[in-house]
Amino acid sequence: MGRAGCRNYGIGIMKLTGLLFFFLVTTIGLNAQNIVFVYENKVYQSNIKTVQCFNTKKEQSVPIYTLKSAETLTFNFDDLKGGNRGYSYTVEHCTSSWKPSKINSIDYLESFNEDIITNYRYSFNTLQKFTHYEIKLPNEQIKPKIAGNYILKVYENANKSRPIISQRFYVLDPVINVGAEIVASSDVANRYKIQKVNFTIFHQMPIQNPYLDIKAIVTQNNNPNGAILNTKPTFIKPGSLVYNELNANEFWGGNEYRKFDTRSFRYKAEHVQDIYVDTINTAVLFNDVNSSGPKYSNQFDENGNFFIRNQDGRNPSTDSDYAKVIFSLNAIPPNEKGSIHVLGQFNNYSIAPANKMVYDENRKKYFANLKLKQGLYDYKYIWLSEDGKIDDTFFEGSFFETDNSYQVFVYYRKPGGRWEELIGFSNVSSLKK
């Protein structure tokens, strides 16, 4: 090849390289722009792990605090990329159905409307390096002044178009009381499988139209999936609203959660079959089977929660390492058109490709591989049908005796008001203790 040919060939390579670079940059830019923010508990980047939000008084409690009190929320997460990536955050007031209230921040904040996360620490003596971030709410920079639902938004480099985390929390102004109880269903066929929630709102405030001004939402184990909305009280009495309609607020009791213990990688604790240590820790769990038998078996669980713990170090937040946790399920699905997922509070009960199980034809089992921080974990298996319906009883069973916690949130919108406020809350166990 002559000099001219070499020169033309080199120019062609440079043009091709330039086009590839342009395509790569454009693709990355489009992907960043295509991130859709949602008003639910969600992680938007795979390097973000172990998101927690709870009332500081009790770890993994419902993320709710009382307005104008000394209570705070603790919110934290890990970034597996390490370093300090300059995360900022803001909060936004929402409706009872978790949609934007569409009011100005000066209506719901008595402070600034955004801040930088300055409290962070680096992991110590771990194979998986990470940075641990934490904030307390409310604080001097972010301080809600009205009750209601709020969404916490974390984003990178002060760019709100690049969301990192969205996290729901609640601010309560307890002007009413809520009494709740768990009873058997009137449905004879399923009364040994279903738990029914009856509740009463006790108030001294004037409520002009309970059908329009009051909404009550009931959840099981602080799981937003399957939340039930109540807009019509069964009985309206002086000073109280009664919600005990037949077949209303009924939940499958489910079963006690499965669990495992990875507080140490030096020995095999509960439900851990093997531990391997290489460039990263690997914990292989014992094989699981279908638990939907005819009889209830009592065992202690944490109602789907998880707790970061570490017996190999001192500080659970920074000394707890990560591991690839291998789940396996030997069970026959209801049909071939659907998928099995591993869910718990550790992944917000959210169905995603990361927690989908894959069938191994050679071993005749379903497997999932999740990267999780050391600790105590509850989990369960659910079936997602082809039409998007969730069945969390097929692999687990359902029993009235199962211990579950139920949350009742009561919202009030003043006549002519522009937003809803959270005025009542109750957290009740299905077991009488």
Describe the role of every protein-language-model region.
Residues 33-66, 173-188, 301-314:
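Short, compositionally biased P/S/T/A/G/V-rich stretches that sit at domain boundaries
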